[in-house]
Amino acid sequence: ENVISVLDAHRHKDMVKGEQIVICGGGLSGCDCALELAMEYGKKPVIVEMMDKLAPKMIMMNRASMQRMLKEQNIEVYTGCRVEKVEDGRVSILDKDNNRSTLRADTVISAFGMRSDNLLADALEKKYGWRVRTVGDCNQIGRVGLAIREGYFAGSTIDE
């Protein structure tokens, strides 16, 4: 009941209840969400990330700026930890040495990552025999620049 997706957290701020927010996943989306909640809404987010560092695919300079902002906002970060379970307003996490910690959470935000979704493209190809070219997040979760290039090249292949 108190677990929502990172997309819902961005789109529906009223779904983010209370002050103590645990964000499960420290990629770009999770870090961005934490900063937004702290800076714009006065929440106290905590980030739990399984990898040793936050947003590993992020450009180094941008990641350094992001980490500085997280520190300035006093956002707690647990790296090298995995979420074991979520229940009764608490998130149980395990570090690499299997030490368990419990975090209080009024709301838990799932930012574990996203997968591409090209079900519509597949259905159109199957039903109508159309050649459908996917671009952006339905093709591969990535960066805006890649989506723009894919869109440009897809558009250039359309027959007149």
Label each region the model flagged.
Residues 2-58, 94-107, 111-160:
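Rossmann-like dinucleotide/flavin-binding elements
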Residues 3, 74-76, 81, 132:
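Short, conserved active-site loop motifs that form the nucleotide-linked donor/cofactor pocket
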Residues 63-66, 151-153:
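Short, hinge-like loop/turn segments at secondary-structure boundaries
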Residues 66-75:
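Helical element adjacent to the flavin cofactor pocket in flavoenzyme catalytic cores
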Residues 76, 84, 101-103:
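Residues that recognize and position ribonucleotide moieties
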Residues 79-90:
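A conserved short coil-to-beta-strand element within the FAD-binding core of flavoproteins
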